[in-house]
Design a protein with these regions (language model features):
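Residue-level preference for long, well-ordered alpha-helices that form the structural scaffold
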Residues: 15-22, 50, 65-68, 141-145, ...
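Alpha-helical scaffolds flanking conserved acidic
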Residues: 178-188
């Protein structure tokens, strides 16, 4: 049973409490899920249906922005096509701070109705988009606010670099398809929270949505091959505010 006095991690982040050790543990959990389900035919067969994922993620997040913001239509439509074609591992598709309960025994992950067998890059982009949007909110403390995102990516990437690593990651090391597509998912998910159907209400300064759009526009060019580059880029943009 979950502790009655548990906290939701999202609330901590919004309040400016940044604990990188939570991000570290979550990175280990997600890496284990992705690694453990790779090549698992039984899981693949049970979770192959992407209907709910499409209805709750691709359509209101990616397609809506592509339709209402024509400047992003080409990269987003391309990303949608590539995402639906991938069948790499179990993808939770709702791995976010609002679904992380902090208990006396550590973080507990809940609520994955959007789970399916697909593109692990979506989980990475979706999760990091939440952390980086909270960083924009707390821009005056950018180095502390962005630390959980850096730690999450470092630990996740390290966990999947252990030999033998999943084939989809091995391909990524030769040509960084996985990492680059994760960056595209990061951009698409951040755009969805400022221009999609489900917008965040905590970016209250007028310049913040525009900064997010400019940042995501840069990421969608495809010229960034490493996630840490994208994270540091946002850090530098915020340091200039």
């Amino acid at each position: 049973a979950i502790d009655a006095d548990h906290r939701v991690w999202k609330a901590d982040l919004l309040d400016g409490v940044f604990d990188s050790s939570i991000a570290e543990r979550l990175a280990g959990h997600l890496a284990a899920i992705h690694r453990g389900s790779t090549g698992n035919g039984e899981i693949a067969e049970r979770m192959r249906d992407q209907t709910v994922f499409d209805e709750l993620r691709l359509d209101p997040f990616y397609r809506y922005v592509a339709e209402t913001c024509p400047q992003f239509a080409t990269p987003l439509n391309s990303l949608i096509k590539r995402t639906t074609q991938r069948q790499d591992c179990l993808v939770l598709a709702d791995f976010s701070p609002k679904n992380v309960l902090l208990t006396s025994n550590g973080p507990v992950i809940v609520d994955f109705e959007t789970g399916h067998y697909g593109d692990p890059g979506f989980d990475i982009g979706f999760f990091l988009s939440h952390l980086l949007l909270k960083t924009v909110r707390h821009h005056e403390r950018v180095s502390k606010a962005i630390a959980p995102a850096k730690r999450f990516w470092s630990v996740y990437r390290g966990e999947l670099s252990v030999v033998p690593s999943p084939e989809w990651l091995a391909v990524g090391r030769r040509n960084p398809t996985f990492e680059r597509q994760s960056i595209e998912h990061l951009a698409a998910c951040m755009l969805a929270r400022v221009d999609g159907k489900s917008r965040v209400d905590y970016l209250t300064e007028s310049w913040q949505p525009d900064l997010v759009r400019d940042f995501c526009d840069d990421l969608l060019t495809g010229r960034h091959s490493h996630m840490i580059e994208a994270i540091v880029l946002l850090e530098r943009l915020l340091e200039c505010r």
